[in-house]
Structures are given as structure tokens and as C-alpha cells.
Amino acid sequence: MASPPESDGFSDVRKVGYLRKPKSMHKRFFVLRAASEAGGPARLEYYENEKKWRHKSSAPKRSIPLESCFNINKRADSKNKHLVALYTRDEHFAIAADSEAEQDSWYQALLQLHNRAKGHHDGAAALGAGGGGGSCSGSSGLGEAGEDLSYGDVPPGPAFKEVWQVILKPKGLGQTKNLIGIYRLCLTSKTISFVKLNSEAAAVVLQLMNIRRCGHSENFFFIEVGRSAVTGPGEFWMQVDDSVVAQNMHETILEAMRAMSDEFRPRSKSQSSSNCSNPISVPLRRHHLNNPPPSQVGLTRRSRTESITATSPASMVGGKPGSFRVRASSDGEGTMSRPASVDGSPVSPSTNRTHAHRHRGSARLHPPLNHSRSIPMPASRCSPSATSPVSLSSSSTSGHGSTSDCLFPRRSSASVSGSPSDGGFISSDEYGSSPCDFRSSFRSVTPDSLGHTPPARGEEELSNYICMGGKGPSTLTAPNGHYILSRGGNGHRCTPGTGLGTSPALAGDEAASAADLDNRFRKRTHSAGTSPTITHQKTPSQSSVASIEEYTEMMPAYPPGGGSGGRLPGHRHSAFVPTRSYPEEGLEMHPLERRGGHHRPDSSTLHTDDGYMPMSPGVAPVPSGRKGSGDYMPMSPKSVSAPQQIINPIRRHPQRVDPNGYMMMSPSGGCSPDIGGGPSSSSSSSNAVPSGTSYGKLWTNGVGGHHSHVLPHPKPPVESSGGKLLPCTGDYMNMSPVGDSNTSSPSDCYYGPEDPQHKPVLSYYSLPRSFKHTQRPGEPEEGARHQHLRLSTSSGRLLYAATADDSSSSTSSDSLGGGYCGARLEPSLPHPHHQVLQPHLPRKVDTAAQTNSRLARPTRLSLGDPKASTLPRAREQQQQQQPLLHPPEPKSPGEYVNIEFGSDQSGYLSGPVAFHSSPSVRCPSQLQPAPREEETGTEEYMKMDLGPGRRAAWQESTGVEMGRLGPAPPGAASICRPTRAVPSSRGDYMTMQMSCPRQSYVDTSPAAPVSYADMRTGIAAEEVSLPRATMAAASSSSAASASPTGPQGAAELAAHSSLLGGPQGPGGMSAFTRVNLSPNRNQSAKVIRADPQGCRRRHSSETFSSTPSATRVGNTVPFGAGAAVGGGGGSSSSSEDVKRHSSASFENVWLRPGELGGAPKEPAKLCGAAGGLENGLNYIDLDLVKDFKQCPQECTPEPQPPPPPPPHQPLGSGESSSTRRSSEDLSAYASISFQKQPEDRQ
């Protein structure tokens, strides 16, 4: 640089020399002049060469007043490493020096003059804002001049540390905020401003605190700001001269952010980071799993930058490590994507915590997730030795830009002091909100409960959510089921009253193992969807660390205790640790107690825990009285039991899962696998279920004496005492509720401890059932309602003896026809087995009894009682004092069964059977079961032949010569599945052949293929012949007289006749028409599946309305078809009786009691409509409950001792005016269970 001349003309010159113009690289002679009265303001001039300047031959090529300069900065670009840039309001002027020393000397000279000029200008013009007062001392290493050495007394104006001229691109916020074009990016110690060219006011001022991240790519630089910025969240993209400038911008801005972090560090240290033991309370977490809003971040945003003491690349080389500021939540959600290892690893506040985190992987960088409030630890907490180099890769991926990343790894992880990669790294915040905190990373950062947790508590307090897992044997569980489970069953758990955030109450030695608890404790997230955090520390109680992918095991805990429903599972699994079902998933809690190797939950023992958390409104924990745990949450309206654990049913009950892998889903109060848990194990036959059958499975839900009623069956139980199921090929999961609500809950479906070897086959597959009905208020007690429908199939079904308790429909009785189970009576066995069972001994034998080692298909599909609600309700406990002996009614619109009702009467009523192409083979119960091959496989499901056991009429009707078999004994239920030998065009679903107990048997064998139910009703008159049209009241009378006198005889007669609305037989009722025969019932047509009150449920069957005016004159009433298909005398009048509604709903199927022969004097009204039923009604539910005790005369004109009401005649017999058993409660669909009291069958 040439020395300024001493002459007067050059007295104001401060510096001269040759410098280059950056673009052209031409050398020019520059002169720096100070302000003078003669020469004017301080200015920078350049000339073509020194000669021209000295000789004053020409004016300077350019003169730039320093007062007008926006800012003066050192710069560098790809061409020139030593630039000094002057920014004016309208242009950017740069000079390039050949060396750094030269650059610095010019820069200092310019800066001094600029500061003076600016000060003078500000003092004179009072222009303070926007002036490019001296470039304030920049952070070291940025090449900025330090302080203004010659300010004199003039304070410099607000100085911009750096100014870059950039072109904002129409992208991101640039477009939305219309910030496009040439701007100056002006950096101060706390802000970044965009000042448009030729403008003095900043268009946008962004706080450094608002910046989430910044980066550069090539010659583009971007800044992402959060929603706290004035512009809202978004990015600014700007183009600069080249990548070197972009990189310089990136590094400079990061350095400024680091400086600000250092400035605020002391304050944040005092706030939180310095003391882990005093966590600040933080706002409740939202469910932003990974991106809690900045508002949720808890600390001031500054804390973001505080804690991490990473150094920028430069500082890492020589800078102080603490200077690097890693941005925490608000800073850098943007940087989340970039890993930022922090160089300091905090001293772990508690050994437990540190330990707990140790097993976590290294540097788990969590997405913005954890902006949430990582409360970074102050550098003081961080052990410097732990420093690990910050990976400074910026989001832009440029190498050095990475400093910015480190500076704000917007992930909270960065904000935590301590490198996430450090195994011992622990977030200072107790909430684990910092992403580095593994807990927080995977739980939706839920610091809530932690606010008050002493850090020493470890993660125990973190589990503020329901620990749906294991429970201690003796300790009560918190209402929400918190358990801190130790594997051995220490049962560490929070006491029910304990606040989640508070330290748990430890019982016994648990206090000693508090550290383990803390370590073991895991915070639960509200959303199960988030991977549950694994146990953070392996404690002795935990076998392994569950993978974060493990599924939450939600096992509600109830305070142990008897009826209150405290149901402590025998063993609880730790909250997140799945049971053995998912061994790879995580820790497994061993059962706290297993007695005798058998799962024996009862009041004295711990209840097994439930697989489901009770989500139904009315479900109460099952009282301790229950013996076991059901597999499924009772979804039936009246179910009382709490859901059972289904996560690992095999572990709890091997039998719970059928060989096909289906879980037993029976919702009923009694577990669908009804157990004859009673002392009597004689029902082994009932237990023995052929594994071969695809559908049916037999099981008993009775206790004790009921077993005696089950005929011994040669086959051993399918299920061994070990509970292993023999493979059953059933395709369906049994979804039907189980009936024995009094004694069993879902937990009761398994044998009680006293009878562990007696295990039902659980693979009974029935079509899904909806609900079960409970005891009706008006139902008779004890044996009055007992009914034994014996479907004596040739294949050897077990006899079903229902007791009062069986009223609740169970899968066995309802869905599987358990209520109507056919049982092959051994010839030696007396009928007393058919007699009324002990009321208190519920017994259900599924129709799917052994059938040559094959399970029978379910007899019906029951859809639940009319008032069944879709919402699960705690099922009402049936009083054992008033058991329902009749099996629960099937609730399906179509019970796909062929039901043949057999009677012990002298003869079967001859009915319109001529047209039956497929005779229903009726076999006396004493007959040996026909071989399985004999059993017809063609009929769709099962046909129940309901006719008095007389082979004469039976042969007549069926055309099958069974005479050699001998007459069926009076008590024998003459029901045989038609053998294959007997050709039959099976009705598609059910052929209900119902004959009244008379000498003439109305064969109801499935005749022409009825689409759903072929309901043949035998007319209770001997003279009635095949297609007889009418039936006289006298016929019914004679039928009544012919029937055995005494309650049983009347009951039997009533059972069959009332079935049909009286002795007349089923008048115009299709197999599943719910015939409301009770005179007391609402006279208006009812909707099936709806109680008389009018609840209606539509099913895919046509609506039929019966009209009381018309009397049925034909055995065949064309219900569905409107024409007598098989009935020769199909009376058209019946069609009007059964007015067919066009709507396909199942409404109005209820026959009015009056027209059904509500009085004994109108028995003929029900004159067989059986024939016509073949084509017509798809589903008919016969509502035929008759209380014979109250109205014996209605059944038979001749006075007889009032027989006990035929048990389980669904919904009021047509003649019984007293049938007020809340028939409505009964199933609206074909519950045709008409077993007569077999006393006459002795």
C-alpha cells in the first residue's frame, strides 16, 4: 500500500494501495479517505492506477461514502479468499486483497472510519437503526474486526455482525410471505434480518431462537424456522454467489447461535439442568408421539441450546468444548433428521437411571419427537472427558455445515447434554422427554407423572399409565392396574391410591428392591400404538429386555378380594412384557402362584388375570367365587365375568386354544367350554367328544349330579387332564355365550380344582351366537321348568338334560343345540336321566356329543335374545334357587336344525309325510347309534324330528321300515339323524318335524327341500292322516286324554302340542317362526327377535303375520311360499292366517296367542300348517312356553293334574295364559326345545 502523501491534498488519506475487483480481478488503486472539512465525509475511492490519483488528472473511478455503507465485512469466495465487502443500501461492493494481512489492514481501516462516520452521522442525523455501525466484534475465527478502537465517545449504531446479499427464492416462506428477490441477510447477536435492497427497514426479523435448523447445498442456503417465528414455521431458501459463501453463512450463523447459547447457559443451568433431582414440572404431554409442539416443551426455548457442549468443528480443534450449543426441542426439530452426538455426557443423576439407560443403543436419534422438553444438562454436569466429537453433518449434508446441526440437532436428543451414543447417557430431565432418553423416545413423551418423581425413582414413576401387566399375589392393584411386576411375583406395584407420579408404595422386601423397581419401572404411554418402552434396566426379576416392538399386555388388575371382583391373576406379566406367546418380545413374568400345576383360580387362590381389560360398561370383575378365568371378555348383555387373558391362553389353560389355533371366544357368563366342574366326573362321556366332527363339540356346564344324567360314553374324554385338546377339525370359533351363569363365568368354563381331570373339549365350533338369555322372572322354579329334549340320533348324541341354570343360553345348549342335545340313551339306562335335573345342577350336553368319534355339527345358530344389546353387559346372575331347566332358546333367525320331537305316545300322528322325499329317520333312543356312515351327510345341518315315539306312524310317514328296531320306549326320544341309507332331499337347513303325542305320528321328516325350515307339525289326532287339512278341537282333546295322565303326560303332550300352539300342532308356523302361543302375550304380531314389547330385529327372512280370524285348515300352511308344498291339503286360508308381508324383515312372525289356540276350545286353529312351511318361512321361532302348573286345562280339555310346565318351551305355550316367563327374554328365534317330563317314560 502506498504511503499517503504528506501534502495538503492528501492530508485526509488514511490508506492507499492496489486491490482487485473480485469479478474482473483487475487491479485498481484504492484510496481510503477520512472525513475532513475540506474533502468531505470519509470515503473509499479507487482509481485506474496510482499515477492518476497522484496527478489528480482525473476524478476517481468510484467513491463510496462510508456513511452510506450498510455494513463492512470480510468475505471469501471460490475465487478470492481475502475479500472485504461493503454493503450499501443499493449495492454490494467488494475488494480482494492478495493476503490475509492486507485484507485485515484494509478491513480495520475501513471499519474505523465507518464507525466514526456512522457515529457522526447518527449523532447528526439521529439515524440509529439500520446503520452499518462498525461491524461489531464477531466471534473469534470469523475474521471480523474486534471492537471499534477509535469510537471516541460516539457509541456505534446497532451493528450487524454479518451481512450477506442473497436472492430469496420463491420457495417455502419466501413464496408464502412474498419475500422474493435481492435481500441482505443481516446477522446480529440475537437476530437475523432480511433487508430488501434499497430499503432501510428490515422486512423480516427472525430470532435466532426461532431457527430450527439451517443448512446449505451448493450455492443455496436455507433456514428453517419454527412456529414461534413471526413468519410461522417454514423455510427460507436463498441463493448466494457460490457454495463457499453458503458454507460461510452456515458456519457463521451456527456460531452466532452457539454464542447465544453460551450467553444463556448460566440461567438455564440454574433452572433445571444443573440439578437432575429437582426436575421442573412440565405440562402434560400431548399425544404428539414424536413432535410435541414447542409450546409443550416446558423450558424456555433457550434451554434448547444450552445443555449440549458440543463444539463446532473449529472449536473442536481448538475451541472450548463447552461453547458448542446443541439445540433442543424448539431449535431443531428440523435437525431431527441429523444425528448430533453431543460431546459431553452428563453425570448420570442416579445410578439407576444411568444404568437403566445403559442398555439402550447408542445414539438413538429420535425424530423431532423429542423436542419435547429435553431439559439439557448444563455443561457442568457433563463430564468433559466423555465428550465425543459432534457429528457435524448438517442437514444439507455438507461437511462443515454440520456444525449447525450439532448446534441445533433440533431433536431434543441433541439438547440433552450427553451424547445419545453414550450408553450411560441420561437426559437430565426426569421426564425422559429428551430424545436421548430412550424412554421418552418411544413413549409418546409423557412427562406428566414424572413431574414429581424423584429422579432416584428411576422410571418407576414414569409408568403413570395403567400397568396392564402382572400383579402381586397379595397386594391390591391400583384401580388402574398399576403393577410393577417382579418376575418372581414380588408384585411390586403402585398401591392403588398411589399417584402415578409419586414413588410407589413398596410392600415387604419391595422397599429393599426399590432400585430394581425403579429400573424395572417403565413408563407407559397413552397410546398403545407406540412401541412400549422396554424395561430400561434388566432387573433380576426380569429375564430379558423386551424389544421395543413388544405389544402391551393389557391386563386389568382388580383388588384381590372376593365378590368385589378383585381378581388378581395367578400371575401377571409385566406391563409391557408379553406373555410366553411372544417370547421374543420381552420379559415374561412367571405366575405368582400355580397350585398343583393346575390353574386353580378360586376365591382362595389368585385369580388368573384377564387377557382383556374390561371395556364393557357393565362388566364387573368376576367375584372370587368364580373358579377360573374365561378366555374372552363377555360380550353378552348379561355377562358378569371380566375378560380373561387371551394373550397366552395356553400358558394359563392349554385347553383354551383349540388345536386349530382358535381362541375360545365364548362370551357367556359361563365360559363356552362349559365344564361339568362338579364333583361327579361321570360325565366323561359328555366330555368325550369325537375329535373328527368339524362343528359340534359336546361339553357339560353342569355340576355334580348332572354328570349322572349324561350317559356314559365309551370314548375317553377328548381332552386329557393336562388340558390338551384332541385335534378337532371344527372351522368355527365358538363365539356363543355359555349358559351356566350362576356357577360359571368365563373363568368358570374350566373345571374346578376339585375336578381338574374333567376337562371339556374346547374345540366345539358353533356358528357364532350373540347372546344368552337369563332367567325370566316368571319362570317356574326347580323341576317345574325342567325339560328334556332328547334328540336321539342314530349317531348317538348325548341326551340333553337341561336344568334351570341352563336357561342362560350357552354355546352348548344354544348355539350347539346343547339345550336340545340329542343323546343316545343306553338301553340299560333308565329314563330318570331324562327326568328333571337338580335345579342347582346345571347341565348342558352339546348336541355335538360323540358321534362315532366325530363332533356333531351345531344344531342351531342363535343370535341372542330379543333384548340382547350389542354392548356387552354384565349378565345378570341367575338365581340358583330358580334355575331354568329348559335349555336356552336358540336366538338365531335360522336354527339350521332338523328337529324331530319324539313322544312316548302309543302312535305317531300320521302327518302329511307322503311328499317327504327324505324321510326323517326316527330311531328310538334305545336303538344303537347308527354308524357314522349311516348318518346322512347330505342334510345341511341337523334335523330334529319332534314326534311321539311310535315307529308305526314313523314307518308310515318316513317309509323307512324301522319296525325291526322295535317300538321306542315311551321315554325314548325318537330322534335319529336320517341315515345315508335313507334317501332324502334334505331341507336346506332345518326340517322341523313336530308331531303331537298321539298314536298317529305325523312324520316330519325333511320333505321337499325346504329352503330353511321344513316344519312338520303332527296333529294331535289319530284320525289325522298325511295331508289332513283340518284338525278338530276334539282331536286335541283326545290327544290330551291319550297322552299319559299326570303332570308328565300333560307336560309331554303340552310340550309337543303347545309347541305348535296347542295340541293342534304347529299351526302355520315355519320351523323358526317364533309363535307366540301364550294367550297372555301381546296379541299383536311381533317381530321375531324382538320381545313382545316391540323390540324388533330384522333378519333375512320374510315377514309373516298371522291373522286370528282365519283358522288353519291344512296341515300345510304355505308360510313362506303361500302354497302347501308337500301338504296335499295345504289350505289357502292358512295363507291369510299367516299374512305374508312383503317386507323381508322377520317382523310379525309372532302368531297371536288367540289365533294360535290361546284357549282350549280353539285348538283347531293351529291346524297343521306344517306342509306349507316347507317352502316358505326361512326362520321361524316357536314361542311355545306353557306354564302347565298354572293352566293345565288349556292344554287338554280333560282335567289332569297340572303337569309341570314343559320346560323350556320357548316363550309361552299358546294355551298357557299364565306363561309370563318374560318370554320376551327368551330367544326370538327357533328355540324349539320341547322335552317332556319323562316320568311317564320310565
Swiss-Prot record:
Entry-linked Pfam families: IRS, PH
GO biological process: cellular response to fatty acid; cellular response to insulin stimulus; cytokine-mediated signaling pathway; glucose homeostasis; insulin receptor signaling pathway; insulin-like growth factor receptor signaling pathway; negative regulation of insulin receptor signaling pathway; negative regulation of insulin secretion
YXXM motif 8 (motif): residue ranges: 989-992
Residue spans of biased composition, Pro residues class: 1198-1209
Motif YXXM motif 4: where in chain: 632-635
CDD domains tied to this protein: PH_IRS, PTB_IRS
Domain PH: from-to ranges: 12-115
Low complexity bias (residue ranges): 269-281, 383-404, 412-424, 801-815, 1210-1220
Localization per Swiss-Prot or TrEMBL: Cytoplasm; Nucleus
Positions occupied by motif YXXM motif 2: 551-554
Biased amino acid composition, Basic residues: 354-363
Residue numbers covered by motif YXXM motif 3: 612-615
Mediates interaction with PHIP as annotated region, ranges: 3-137
Motif (YXXM motif 6): 732-735
Name of the protein described by the UniProt record: Insulin receptor substrate 1
